[in-house]
């Protein structure tokens, strides 16, 4: 309850509404970008690269031992800022080694986190679960003002299609 109150209180201040009742009434009578801001305010975005590492081991084994006609189609729901879909894409690319086509769609209801995911820029420290071999294969390290940052390489970025669903 406190989390919802806190998050929506910010929306009230930014939109100039005096109460939750006024704000929700206004939302019900207006289509437009504030609906997406409302959704974004209520989402929680907890993610990391190779979170629940054993899941990726199971996925790799599954991909290597199964054949599929027409290629793999994978959906990553609640993609957040992209760490999990990129982890899935790395696992797929390593496991299939271009033997089978794949399509990975990553969706979320929060447009702001998806914009971040599409950029594919992360703090190097957030890749603690990504080994050095993967880091070199799939990421570009920042230099100068961007030192301590990484960007996904085009090969990895192109393996994921990000979609806002809501």
Question: Residue locations for each model-derived region?
Answer:
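Conserved AdoMet
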Residues: 1-75
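Conserved class I S-adenosyl-L-methionine
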Residues: 69-87, 101-105
């Amino acid at each position: 309850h406190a989390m919802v109150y806190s998050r929506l209180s910010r929306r009230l201040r930014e939109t100039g509404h005096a109460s939750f009742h006024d704000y929700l009434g206004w939302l019900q009578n207006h289509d437009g970008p504030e609906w997406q801001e409302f959704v974004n305010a209520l989402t929680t975005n907890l993610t990391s690269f190779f979170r629940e590492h054993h899941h990726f081991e199971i996925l790799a084994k599954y991909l290597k031992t199964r054949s599929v006609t027409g290629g793999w189609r994978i959906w990553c729901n609640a993609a957040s800022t992209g760490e999990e879909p990129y982890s899935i894409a790395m696992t797929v690319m390593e496991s299939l080694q271009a033997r089978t086509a794949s399509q990975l769609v990553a969706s979320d209801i929060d447009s702001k986190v998806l914009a971040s995911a599409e950029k594919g820029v992360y703090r190097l420290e957030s890749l603690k679960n990504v080994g050095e071999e993967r880091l070199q294969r799939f990421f570009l390290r920042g230099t100068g003002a961007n030192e301590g940052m990484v960007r996904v390489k085009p090969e990895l970025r192109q393996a994921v299609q990000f979609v806002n669903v809501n």
